[in-house]
């Protein structure tokens, strides 16, 4: 259990770091590819046994944070927030990171409770 938590905290950091480094287009492609990969995993549940460190909270956090990313991107387009406005871009990048961290924490808690319930049943 601890191994999975440590592994997925590492994954969470990997999902957060591009927010500060990448452009809007690269970041959008990155998020879309994440959602597509999760969708493929959900369509083939028998393969999940072959990927032991794919945790429930990762599956939950990525689509949720991607939806928020798309929402914030639409807000940026509506209010004409461009890349030249560096302060706004940094603030939004930080906001995306916080959203992802919050959803990951909530989903990690749900995952831990789920694992405890499985252990109690056995």
UniProtKB/Swiss-Prot annotation:
Membrane topology: Multi-pass membrane protein
Source organism per UniProt: Saccharomyces cerevisiae (strain ATCC 204508 / S288c)
Protein name: Putative uncharacterized protein YCL065W
Other remarks on this protein: Partially overlaps HMLALPHA1.
Gene Ontology cellular component list: membrane
Main location: membrane
Membrane spanning stretches: 21-40, 57-77, 94-114
Subcellular localization, as worded in the UniProt entry: Membrane
Keywords of this entry: Membrane, Transmembrane, Transmembrane helix
